[in-house]
């Protein structure tokens, strides 16, 4: 049995109901039809909360949206007073196989935690993510857990465990010698957090990952070559361009980890679809990205979390990394580059994914724009906008109700009271 699938089986048993329990039940079916009646509807597209709108769901899809809908005899009415109904939120940058670094360091997670333990945690984290109203995630690398994300995705899709829809990157790709863990005796072969490849071998590695189930290819365009060093570029433009061509030919998008201006420039010119982090991005780099249609996933929450783990309490004076990140985010906003929402969740707790949304608004992005980015915007960037990210007829019924009005008070996204995925209600907080 494949090592990753074996670990997934062990993990599912560990978090299941135990020896002698009843056989697993089939995945729940959506209700025949339901009319959802919130106070208002944020459809993900126009940035407004439409008061008095209702949403009719039939099976797994949305049938109608508007103010004058009534329930026929065969339609269940779901009353959600005091709430705003939104599309299921999308986190475009998670690592379900990581957990917060103030619990266990990244090195120790990669080197010391057994795969079955990491998979069991990932199962729990997937459920927490869904319960928080995030019905889709893009998982950008298992960080040493191989292809276990493919198995977790299958378990969710088959209804074995609850969780969001997943787009997975499996192992991700790094230049030889550039990634971690680092700082060990060179005589020891240390497991790596991603797959190493260079030159023509890089395309072969990308194709292998796609063949094993990757929905997206992730490259590290820059990283710290030595422990404690600043990030520097890794791959050449030509290396990354070859991967982009291979991935796009296979119908996959490419995400690039890049924090330095040069790493971001190379990745953009290579044709990647999104750049993750962009910590030191400049006005010139963001203009280049906009011209090439490259999106930025700023991952504000990860940087915020790391500084808090180091002792910062959120007050002034801010650490230098936060000051620099604020400046780059302001430049990105001013440039008009497409922004996706993804917190690098896993650096901080799964289930608190909305932390990124709240920070983006707190750092100057209009709440309505952040909400659109977290729904229809993310769906478009990830290539799933034909079926997810908006409340409109024909779309999949991935829906979340939050207490209050998130356009007026962005913190409302943290007050999730009702969640449906594909027309199946998976969370309902008593009113």
Locations of the language-model features?
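Histidine-rich, glycine-flanked metal-binding segment
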Residues: 27-32, 41, 46-86
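Metal-associated gating/positioning segment near the N- to mid-region
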Residues: 83-160, 176, 184, 238, ...
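Active-site gating loops and adjacent loop-to-helix segments of metal-dependent hydrolytic enzymes
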Residues: 97-118, 176-191, 225-233, 290-323, ...
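Histidine/acidic-residue-rich catalytic or RNA/ligand-binding cores of hydrolases
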Residues: 100-102, 149, 178, 228, ...
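Divalent metal-dependent hydrolysis catalytic cores, especially in the metallo-beta-lactamase
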Residues: 121-147, 163-171, 214-225, 253, ...
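Histidine/acidic residue-rich metal-binding segments in metalloenzymes
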Residues: 200-296, 320-338
């Amino acid at each position: 049995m494949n090592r990753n699938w074996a670990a997934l089986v062990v993990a599912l048993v560990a978090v299941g109901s135990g020896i002698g329990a009843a056989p697993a039940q089939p995945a729940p079916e959506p209700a025949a039809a339901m009319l959802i009646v919130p106070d208002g509807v944020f459809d993900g597209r126009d940035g407004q909360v439409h008061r008095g709108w209702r949403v009719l769901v039939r099976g797994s899809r949305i049938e109608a949206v508007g103010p004058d809908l009534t329930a026929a005899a065969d339609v269940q009415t779901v009353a959600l007073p005091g709430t705003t109904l939104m599309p299921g939120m999308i986190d475009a940058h998670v690592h379900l196989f990581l957990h917060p670094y103030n619990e266990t360091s990244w090195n120790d997670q990669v080197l010391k935690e057994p795969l079955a333990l990491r998979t069991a945690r990932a199962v729990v984290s997937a459920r927490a993510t869904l319960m928080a109203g995030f019905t889709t995630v893009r998982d950008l690398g298992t960080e040493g857990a191989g292809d276990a994300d493919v198995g977790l995705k299958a378990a969710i899709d088959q209804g074995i465990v609850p969780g969001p829809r997943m787009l997975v990157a499996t192992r991700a790709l790094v230049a030889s010698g550039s990634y971690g863990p680092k700082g060990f005796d060179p005589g020891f072969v240390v497991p790596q957090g991603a797959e190493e490849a260079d030159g023509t071998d890089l395309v072969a590695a990308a194709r292998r990952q796609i063949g094993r189930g990757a929905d997206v290819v992730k490259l590290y365009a820059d990283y710290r070559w030595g422990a404690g060093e600043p990030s520097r570029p890794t791959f050449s433009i030509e290396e990354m361009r070859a991967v982009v061509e291979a991935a796009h030919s296979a119908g996959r998008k490419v995400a690039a980890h890049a924090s330095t201006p040069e790493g971001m420039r190379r990745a953009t010119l290579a044709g990647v679809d999104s750049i993750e982090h962009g910590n030191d991005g400049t006005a010139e780099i963001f203009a280049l990205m906009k011209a090439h249609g490259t999106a930025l996933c700023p991952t504000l929450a990860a940087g915020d979390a790391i500084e808090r783990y180091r002792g910062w309490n959120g007050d002034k004076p801010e650490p230098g990394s936060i000051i620099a990140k604020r400046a780059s985010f302001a430049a990105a906003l001013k440039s008009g580059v497409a922004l996706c929402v993804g917190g690098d969740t896993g650096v901080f707790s799964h289930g608190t994914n909305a932390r990124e949304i709240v920070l983006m608004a707190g750092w100057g992005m209009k709440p309505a724009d952040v909400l659109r980015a977290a729904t229809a915007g993310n769906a478009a960037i990830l290539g799933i906008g034909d079926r997810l990210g908006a409340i409109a007829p024909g779309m999949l019924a991935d829906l979340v109700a939050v207490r209050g009005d998130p356009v007026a008070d962005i913190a409302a996204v943290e007050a999730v009271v009702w969640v449906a995925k594909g027309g199946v209600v998976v969370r309902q907080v008593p009113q």
